[in-house]
Design a protein with these regions (language model features):
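Short helices/loops that flank or line small-molecule/ion binding pockets
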Residues: 23, 37-41, 96-98, 110-124, ...
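Short helix-initiation/N-cap motifs at beta->coil->alpha
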Residues: 30-33, 104-117, 129
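Paired acidic/hydrophobic, glycine-rich loop segments that form the ligand-binding mouth/hinge
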Residues: 122-127, 143-145
Length: 264
């Protein structure tokens, strides 16, 4: 309606798969089975921060299991479900199976970019903020796509993900509120968002900037758009992050005896 209600900056706070097309085909990156097999065959690696609760969510959400924030700030979670199409334990075992591959590396963003730059890592689950690093590492092979499917009880299940946005905040108690609001308005205007998007790979929230040729043609943003069909808005309570990370680390290490007990 032409009115400014806030200062939205980006609409690309999600994750997808970067990969080097010099080593991997579109068929290779369509599933975790194919991806890891191709990497193992070539003596290369694939990265994802499985021990990060933000990324781990994608497996369980893709299998139709729930994690969401209630009005009182608590969470509703059925990742230990035994009466759903895909049991939580089956999903957890599928994650552990992925992590057992000698090509799979559980790593954070900075390490993944370093591994890609030295030629070791040919694919990584990451976000738009990592675009410049993977562009440099993969060169003319730089590519991106939606997240792979993974195998649960013999079925190929599409991974889900989180989707989110970033805003510029203004301190209402600053001595220079007016100037601060003008700065926020400048940072988030169409021209600035377009420039930031071109420089960093982030996706603008401004609709005109988002459809500009320079932005719309970016592989990472095209991949994010493709993944958005399987993404959920990030609506989880604060008590999710710690236990989620602990669960992810346990699945990475295989440090459990009873997966149902682990989920419970």
């Amino acid at each position: 309606d032409g009115k400014l209600y806030a200062y939205p900056l980006t609409a690309s706070n999600g994750y997808f798969l970067f990969y080097d097309s010099n080593y991997l085909t579109e068929e290779d990156v369509s599933s975790w089975d194919n991806l890891l097999a191709a990497a193992e065959k070539q003596g290369k690696t694939v990265g994802m921060e499985v021990s990060g609760a933000w990324f781990l969510y994608g497996f369980f959400a893709g299998a139709g299991l729930d994690m969401y924030r209630n009005d009182d700030g608590s969470n509703t979670c059925n990742w230990n479900a035994i009466d759903t199409k895909y049991k939580g334990a089956d999903v957890a075992e599928a994650i552990s199976q992925i992590c057992q591959s000698k090509a799979m590396v559980n790593c954070v963003n900075e390490d993944a970019q370093a591994f890609a730059l030295n030629g070791e890592m040919i694919a990584d689950v990451n976000g738009t903020w990592a675009t410049p690093g993977f562009q440099e590492a993969y060169g003319d092979g730089y590519a991106a796509t939606k997240l792979p499917t993974f195998t649960v009880n013999g079925d190929q299940v599409q991974m889900g993900s989180f989707a989110g946005y970033k805003f510029v905040g203004v301190n209402a108690y600053t001595k220079n509120t007016g100037w601060a609001m003008l700065l926020a308005e400048y940072i988030t205007n169409e021209a600035s968002q377009k420039a930031i998007g071109i420089a960093t790979g982030e996706g603008p929230s401004n609709l005109n900037a988002a459809v500009s040729e320079e932005i719309a043609s970016a592989p990472a943003l095209a991949a994010l758009s493709e993944q958005s069909a399987f993404a959920d808005l990030q609506r989880v309570g604060n008590n999710y992050w710690g236990p989620g990370a602990t669960l992810g680390q346990s699945l990475v290490e295989g440090s459990y005896t009873d997966v149902q007990e682990l989920l419970d």
